[in-house]
A protein has these predicted regions:
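HDAC/HDAC-like amidohydrolase catalytic core signature
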Residues: 4-15, 22-344
Length: 344
């Protein structure tokens, strides 16, 4: 069994302050029309490196997606560009999921710049669910880094992750926005062990994951279905190496859709890892851009059927820059199509 690059990867320790010219810089581009109902979140602070220059989790990941989406004028015109929450709102949201020891550990062990980077990803996730839950947008995509679904409460980076963005967003949806049942769909190539761990005994959050069980962190099995009040609200579907669009879409139709029907979510979140795409440097699946488009349509149809279309997608993995950008572009197009199909 090969040792995966995510194992033992050490983050940089960066203590330098973030330049005011970088922090919070608004993305450029034409204003979105009033009809735009899909939110778009990115931030110049995602240019802060978390690892050495040769590391696959690099600032170029978000830049590649930004460039691909902004180059498509028709798609860019369908998006509402919004800004992340900051400061006390992020502090409060982190405290709902992460221990004080973990939060202090990230800042002390990895430095102020990396902590700012990770908090910006959280702030974008919070603003996205806020915009969908309260401000009238139907759905949103958050082009953020670093990823988050491996983060637990270890006080350090795990699998390139510092804070669990999707878990923090989930608790914000519940505790601040007042939605009770949240469905998390994780299609990253790697199992989201952090997300599973944080909600394993929580019946208000349904965690659905497809992944390669032989890859880092080797934690997900079909036998793990939740415990206590959360029994039955974790559903893991390991896929074999080389898994295709048809493989994952069959799982979605036969397992995800019926599970969502039973759970009846009030809000849907996606851990959108694009390292399952063919040609990824860390993955061994063969999903295509069309596969991601179809997967998005399935998840968006669940959101439309159960919760008025409310869906927020957060970037997780994806390390072949060209493939990442192309798959994310297909995903965002499908989100805008789903949003425009929803009645006002």
């Amino acid at each position: 069994m090969r040792r995966h690059l995510l194992e033992g990867a050490g983050a940089l320790v960066l203590g330098a302050a973030v330049s005011p010219s970088v922090a919070g810089t608004a993305p450029k581009g034409p204003a979105a029309p009033a009809a735009a109902r899909t939110g778009w979140f990115d931030d110049a602070r995602f240019a802060i490196p978390a690892f050495e220059a040769s590391h696959p989790e690099q600032p170029g990941r978000v830049r590649a997606i930004q460039d691909r989406v902004r180059a498509d004028a028709a798609l860019w015109a369908r998006l509402q560009r919004l800004q992340p929450l900051q400061g006390a709102a992020v502090d409060a949201a982190l405290a709902r999921v992460h221990t004080g020891e973990h939060i202090r550990g990230i800042a002390v062990r990895h430095g102020a710049a990396i902590d700012t980077l990770a908090r910006t990803a959280v702030g974008c996730a919070l603003a996205a669910v806020q915009a969908v839950g309260r401000a009238g947008l139907t759905n949103a995509f958050v082009a953020s880094r670093p990823p988050g679904h491996h983060a637990r409460n270890s006080g350090r980076e795990e699998g390139f992750c510092f804070y669990n963005n999707v878990a923090v967003a989930t608790r914000h949806v519940q505790r601040v926005l007042g939605f009770e049942r949240v469905l998390i769909v994780d299609w990253d190539y790697h199992h989201g062990n952090g997300t599973e761990h944080l909600f394993y005994e929580d019946g208000s959050v349904f965690y659905f994951s497809t992944f390669d069980a032989d890859a880092y962190p080797r934690s997900g099995t079909a036998a793990r279905i939740g415990a206590g009040a959360g029994r039955g609200t974790t559903l893991n579907h390991p896929l074999p190496a080389g898994a295709s669009d048809d493989d994952v879409l069959t799982v979605y139709e036969r397992s995800l859709v019926p599970a969502a029907t039973r759970f009846d979510p009030e809000f849907v979140l996606v851990s959108a890892g694009f390292d399952s795409r063919e040609g990824d440097t860390l993955g061994r699946f063969s999903f295509s851009d069309e596969g991601y488009r179809r997967m998005t349509r399935v998840v968006a149809s669940i959101a439309a059927r159960h919760c008025g279309g409310r869906l927020v997608s957060l970037l997780e993995g994806g390390y072949n820059l060209g493939g990442l950008a192309s798959a994310a572009h297909a995903h965002v197009w499908a989100l805008t199509e789903a949003a425009l199909a929803m009645p006002r």
